[in-house]
Amino acid sequence: MVNVERELEREAEEVVRGILDDLGGFSVSSQHGRSVGDARCDVVIEAKSRDAVFRIALEVKKRITPQTTISLCERMRQLPDDLIPVIYAPVISPRVAEIANEFGIGYVDRAGNCRLRSVGDRLLIDRRGYKSPSRPPQGVADPFSPKSSRIVRALLGRPAEGWKVRELAEHTDVEVSVGLVSKVKRTLVEEGYAIEHKRLLYLRDPVGLLENWAKRYPGPAEQIPMYFRGDAEAAEEAVGKWCQDNDIPYALAGFSAGWRLAPEVRHNVAAVYVHNRGFDREVFDKLGSYQGGKRVETGANLLLWRPFDHSVFADSNPPSRAEKPRTSALQTYLDLKRLAGRGEEAATAVYEKHLAHQLQEGARRVKELQHEEL
């Protein structure tokens, strides 16, 4: 076991030396198992240039997960300021790199991907894109798949709350097996998005979880461009009436929902999520009786969206009967974020008005819980 650890330390040293050699102009020396203050570093590498000396403190791990990265980074932040704290592991996942950056800790992997940053940015090395072989962990649930994302949606909807596994499984907007919730819980904890405190699941990083969900979010299962007589608002009225007359659940979405959540969001093409039943041929053909609704290749003023999962309708009830149902701020953000240009601007407006404060307060609450444990 000791030999394996020593071999990994030598590997880490060689990779860092190679990175510094690529830059040129450094004289490099190293020490293994060196004590620095109250801490002990696996490897300390000293890199001297003509006008500066940089000391890199390497913590070497055979395998590192986002969950273990958090505690490791908290410890490494206590190192003296003249050291550049760096994690080395053969494989560094994007999530581990993200957490390390959040704490101001550097990282290096076997392939040479790295971020090394000294105080005052006198040294800044950021290399990405080198392929590192990795295998996905077995038996781990993808939290962003259609069913699993229902769990994520419920957690983000009340980010300061603690949840029991069964409570999540039985939530009206979730309704999945206890087994799936347990798997997703494990993934969220291991990926550093959540913690378990007194047998309750809390979100540690709701902002990061939402950002990564947005990157993976697939959008509607189907999009049908439609034209109705009149403008986008008239098209929304026509589809709303068609849905009511045929008892079809629906919700204004995309820019249509964004405008109602943040008035600065402007749109000339509406979007509406319609329950799968609305796509049945017999029901769909009735749209022609509503402002001449028809499918078009160009010139659409409304996009008819088939949901990837019924959870898009969560929290879509209108504030009053006079208003049409629209997607929640969370769902609206996801749909707008995937649209380039104005979509991203609109997503930011919705986020700032309706999501940012709640998510940040949730993260603050979890930090308080963690401090209570110390």
Placement of each model-derived feature along the sequence:
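Short gly/ser-rich loop at a beta-strand->alpha-helix junction or flexible surface loop bordering the NTP-binding
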Residues: A221-H310
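Acidic-basic catalytic patches of nuclease active cores, encompassing PD-(D/E)XK
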Residues: M1-S35
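Loop-centered beta-sheet repeat module
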Residues: I151-A214
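A short alpha->loop->secondary-structure connector
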Residues: E102-R115, R122-D126
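Nucleic-acid nuclease catalytic cores
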Residues: P80-G104, V108
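Hydrophobic alpha-helical interaction segments
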Residues: R281-L374
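Short alpha-helical segments that sit at the start of domains
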Residues: L123-V152
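Conserved catalytic cores of phosphodiester-cleaving nucleases, focusing on short active-site segments
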Residues: A39-P80, P85-I87, Y333
